[in-house]
Amino acid sequence: MKKYVLAFDQGTTSCRAILFDKDGKKIETAQQEFSQIFPKQGWVEHDAMEIWGKQSGVAREVLERSGVSTQEIAAIGITNQRETTVVWNKNTGRPVCNAIVWQCRRTADICDALKEKGLSDSIRKKTGLIIDAYFSGTKIKWILDNVPEARTLAEKGELLFGNIDTWLIWNLTRGKVHVTDYTNASRTLLFNIHTLQWDKELLKAMDIPESMLPEVKPSSYVYGYTEEHTFGGSKIPIAGAAGDQQAALFGQACFEEGSAKNTYGTGCFMLMNTGDKIIESENGLLTTIAFGIDNSVKYALEGSSFIAGAAVQWLRDELKLIYTAHETEYYAGLVNDTNGVYFVPAFSGLGAPYWDMYARGALLGLTRGAKREHIVRAVLEAIAYQTKDVLYAMEKDSKINLKSLKVDGGACANNFLMQFQSDILNVPVLRPYEKETTALGAAYLAGLAVGFWKEQGEIKRIQDIEREFRPDMEEEKRKTLYAGWKKAVERSMKWA
């Protein structure tokens, strides 16, 4: 009897495995953090072998702790940090270098060269993305141009590229399946979201052999099966995959056009479902694929802020102003405002809607009266301001006024932040009972592919809201606070 779906949630800082039942309830979870590698200023890397080891390890741990056998698992669904780039030798199964993480800025010069060639409009129209070091395409090019023998091996057809979903599926199937889904493909800067194919002109522009690229399939689809000995017992279908933000959109049951969610993780990511329509943003947002099921693809507008929860980690690990992330709610509540302090978390540039690779972090408005509490509160408020920037752009592009915002991710547990978010947006903020919506989205996609859930309506019926935060701020105050934020952002831009 198939009773559960196993979700792999491979994030920027940790590998997690979560077991869900038929009601979408979390049964058991396991998590392991892995190494963050910073070889040079602005560079961020991960060890892909470590990621595979820890991801398979937490999956085994979940099965052992829950006492659930592989025979009871209907399917595995995978959600992953997007854009992070792995290139490996298909004969040895080993990466040619560390994975280049989405936050890494080393390819800024390659991006500038593509812009100088006049490719910005073409890339925008074909991929829905802008030219930025964030996306996978320039990372692949950097590896081919800089890792010894990489280009030679790639041209011989011996190297494979994948984002983390592809890397995990390849390892789970012992190298039998080299595949990705529409959502992950749409984040590479190489995938045409109109034709749903790898774009030969863009591959030529970046000098990337097509033989490296995975096959692209729907987000809800049986890609292959685990080997019997991988987790002991029977083979398990690998039946769903989606980039983390699209998985969260699906996990929040944002199936209708105009519905939106914001994920508060390492970065902050807002997606709005635009249905069958590809909306080309005029306000610095990305157009991306929301999910693909059967022969139907839904699209989304996305705005991403690179740094959100990572700024709280910085308060804890570098400034030592707090011991735990949870304390930020307490300190923020000790003061009525930030005493004029603004924080711009542009540690790795600014994302939507500014897209300034050369912006840097800034703490502004400091006086002798500024205390720890003011700085902590300013960091939390910055997360909410970035979300307002994105929502304002989204409403202009889509011509849809958001009625409510669904939220998820670690920081959505912070009641101060959620209330301030509602206040500054002037819309209700809805927090679900099940906070693991990213993993849940991967589970739903996998479960639908194997008939564990029959259709999207069944998923919608099991959704529960834990708390609704309603706006409680005067319009004049909202405008004044936001004007201060815009001024602070302007000061941080074009710094490096």
Swiss-Prot record:
- Stored Pfam families: FGGY_C, FGGY_N
The record lists the catalysed reaction(s) as: glycerol + ATP = sn-glycerol 3-phosphate + ADP + H(+)
**GO molecular function list:** ATP binding; glycerol kinase activity
Pathway assigned to this chain's UniProt record: Polyol metabolism; glycerol degradation via glycerol kinase pathway; sn-glycerol 3-phosphate from glycerol: step 1/1
Keyword entries, A-Z: ATP-binding, Glycerol metabolism, Kinase, Nucleotide-binding, Transferase
Q: What is its EC number?
A: 2.7.1.30
Domain of life of the source: Bacteria
GO biological process assignments: glycerol catabolic process; glycerol metabolic process; glycerol-3-phosphate metabolic process
Activity regulation: the record says:
Inhibited by fructose 1,6-bisphosphate (FBP).
Sites binding ADP sit at T12, R16, T266, G309, G410, N414
Q: Name one GO cellular component term.
A: cytosol
EC category name: transferase
Q: Which amino acids does the record list as binding sn-glycerol 3-phosphate?
A: T12, R82, E83, Y134, D244
Which cysteines form disulfides? none
HAMAP family assigned = Glycerol_kin (MF_00186)
Function of the protein: Key enzyme in the regulation of glycerol uptake and metabolism. Catalyzes the phosphorylation of glycerol to yield sn-glycerol 3-phosphate.
What's the protein name?
Answer: Glycerol kinase
**What is the native source organism of this protein?**
Treponema denticola (strain ATCC 35405 / DSM 14222 / CIP 103919 / JCM 8153 / KCTC 15104)
